[in-house]
């Protein structure tokens, strides 16, 4: 069932991120820009210049599979940039451009009407568990036009193609090829964004979920120094694997792919067709809490990002960071049929000696619902941040660590109680504000079409807040509630209508019972929800 649950999460993200088609109210106007590799011809529609599918690195195929990204080759003449490039290989999700190993491209959106003064740049890194997603799922036209900024979205290698580490691979980039792709795209941006009207000195990296994890990793990566001036982390933490963990995971994949002999595994894997590797990679990419992650203890990530943040060894840039209020509620659905006894057994299995204290704070009886166990266990998971540190108390602590060194740190919680969702859930189940539910408020997606007038008002406000941060390293902007820094003792509660407001940080701490969680010792969740539910005896249907 874990595959089914993970597939539901990935499919939800894919559905959420189905970009709308280019508006047709204005005829596209062709235009040409010169890059360091050659000229590209994009098109203008509805006030936004769009340049799509521009290669920023050489195709990582053949002997370049599992190598750091190499420079793209120059081209003669003018290259068409009116269609998205291929998505990086992943399990099929939804519609869109085809998939290919030759996928290292990016997209640039810039306002048609602009002055000669270079514009700030928002550099977007997509989520999807480092296993799915693509830059084309995020149409940057709306954010670019509304804020008079440039938006860049990218593809990077995913799954076994982006995060494999096995003995025999060159230590340069092993396990972190996707992260190195992101850095290569940032270097392309530094070299070329001026030709598109952007300011290379004012690049803000931003991402959600795995994209947010990536932002934290880039903040911790010495080779990324100087490539950006600000950062936005949405529902992302700072997780990573050790080299030993990554190579063990890689060896399991090599065995599944029929390349178990250590001395020959790399040559064997490189000789495999990409589709065979993709088929063999389900164990590598699948499973909540068991998917690929960046690898630390290597030159591009000498320290685990969480350690780098805690000790201050990061690129000290302004930061906007936050999460949704109910990050993991939908991931707790394996407990939909759980009884009180099964819920309590699961908490005991996961938290051991701390279980009684936790159950006193999260009693089954607090939820008068057929889904009481799901609501109770998701609440304690949210508040304790046991899923990669997402949301809750560890997330507030992470923000405090950033803010201790960077005064321009801004914290939020997406608090819309009923955002649109395309996820399939049981009748009567309240998803709250789950993981990724804020995306349709910032980018034009399928869920964007379902926003109520009050939610649309929040969407407009969020687009403006994010744009203000990209432009000024401060999200406060005229006509909206002021957003003080975290150092002022406040965070922003994002609500529909005009109800968004800055609240005291103690409100967040009380909401998530942080006095309790900060008083006990516990580890992150090590058992995925399906397995934990099965161990507790919860029926599957």
Describe every region a protein language model picked out.
Residues 2-26:
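Secretory targeting and sorting signals
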Residues 27-176, 448-462, 473-479, 500, ...:
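Non-catalytic accessory segments of hydrolases
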Residues 392-541:
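Mobile gating loops/cap/lid regions near enzyme active sites that modulate substrate access
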Residues 127, 177-181, 209-212:
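Active-site loop->helix "elbow" adjoining a glycine-rich segment at hydrolase catalytic centers
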Residues 103, 173-194, 245, 251-252:
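Alpha/beta-hydrolase active-site loop
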Residues 92-94, 191, 225, 234-349, ...:
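Substrate-access "cap/lid" subdomains that shape
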Residues 212-224:
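Short glycine-enriched nucleophile-adjacent loop
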Residues 196-208:
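Alpha/beta-hydrolase fold nucleophile elbow
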């Amino acid at each position: 069932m874990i595959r089914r649950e993970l597939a539901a999460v990935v499919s939800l993200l894919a559905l959420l991120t189905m970009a709308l088609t280019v508006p047709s109210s204005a005829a596209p106007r062709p235009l040409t820009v010169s890059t360091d590799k050659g000229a590209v011809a994009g098109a203008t529609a509805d006030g936004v210049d769009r340049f799509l599918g521009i290669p920023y690195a050489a195709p990582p195929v053949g002997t370049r599979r599992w190598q750091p990204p190499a420079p793209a080759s120059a081209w003669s003449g003018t290259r068409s940039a009116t269609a998205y490039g291929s998505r990086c290989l992943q399990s099929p999700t939804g519609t869109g451009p085809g998939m290919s190993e030759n996928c290292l491209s990016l997209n640039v959106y810039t306002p048609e009407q602009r002055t000669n003064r270079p514009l700030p740049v928002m550099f977007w890194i997509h989520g999807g568990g480092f296993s799915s997603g693509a830059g084309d799922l995020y149409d940057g036209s709306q954010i670019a036009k509304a804020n008079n900024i440039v938006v860049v979205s990218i593809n990077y290698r995913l799954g076994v193609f982006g995060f494999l580490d096995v003995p025999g691979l060159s230590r340069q980039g092993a396990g972190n090829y996707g992260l190195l792709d992101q850095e290569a795209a940032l270097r392309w941006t530094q070299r070329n964004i001026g030709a598109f009207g952007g300011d290379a000195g004012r690049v803000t990296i931003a991402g959600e979920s795995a994209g947010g994890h990536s932002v934290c990793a880039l903040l911790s990566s010495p080779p990324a120094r100087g490539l950006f001036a600000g950062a936005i982390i949405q529902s992302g933490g700072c997780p990573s694997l050790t080299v030993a963990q990554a190579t063990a995971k890689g060896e399991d994949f090599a065995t599944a792919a029929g390349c178990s002999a250590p001395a020959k595994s790399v040559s064997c894997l490189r000789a495999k067709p990409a589709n065979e590797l993709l088929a063999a990679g389900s164990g590598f990419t699948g499973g909540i809490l068991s998917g690929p992650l960046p690898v630390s203890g290597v030159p591009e990530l000498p320290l685990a990002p969480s350690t780098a943040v805690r000790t201050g060894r990061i690129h000290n840039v302004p930061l906007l960071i936050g999460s949704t209020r109910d990050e993991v509620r939908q991931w707790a659905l394996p407990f939909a049929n759980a009884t009180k006894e099964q819920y309590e057994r699961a908490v005991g299995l996961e938290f051991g000696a701390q279980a009684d204290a936790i159950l006193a704070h999260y009693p089954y009886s607090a939820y008068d619902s057929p889904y009481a166990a799901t609501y109770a266990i998701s609440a304690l998971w949210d508040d304790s941040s046991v899923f990669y540190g997402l949301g809750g108390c560890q997330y507030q602590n992470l923000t405090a660590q950033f803010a201790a060194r960077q005064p321009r740190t801004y914290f939020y919680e997406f608090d819309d109680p009923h955002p649109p969702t395309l996820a399939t859930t049981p009748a009567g189940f309240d998803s709250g504000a789950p993981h990724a539910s804020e995306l349709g408020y910032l980018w034009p997606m399928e869920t964007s079409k379902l926003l109520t007038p009050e939610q649309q008002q929040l969407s407009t406000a969020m687009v403006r807040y994010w744009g203000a941060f990209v432009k000024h390293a401060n999200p406060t902007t005229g006509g909206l509630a002021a957003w003080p820094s975290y150092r002022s003792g406040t965070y922003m509660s994002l609500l529909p209508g005009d109800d968004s407001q800055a609240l005291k940080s103690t409100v967040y701490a009380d909401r998530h019972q942080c006095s309790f969680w900060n008083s006990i010792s516990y580890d992150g969740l090590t058992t995925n929800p399906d397995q934990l539910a099965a161990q507790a005896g919860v029926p599957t249907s």
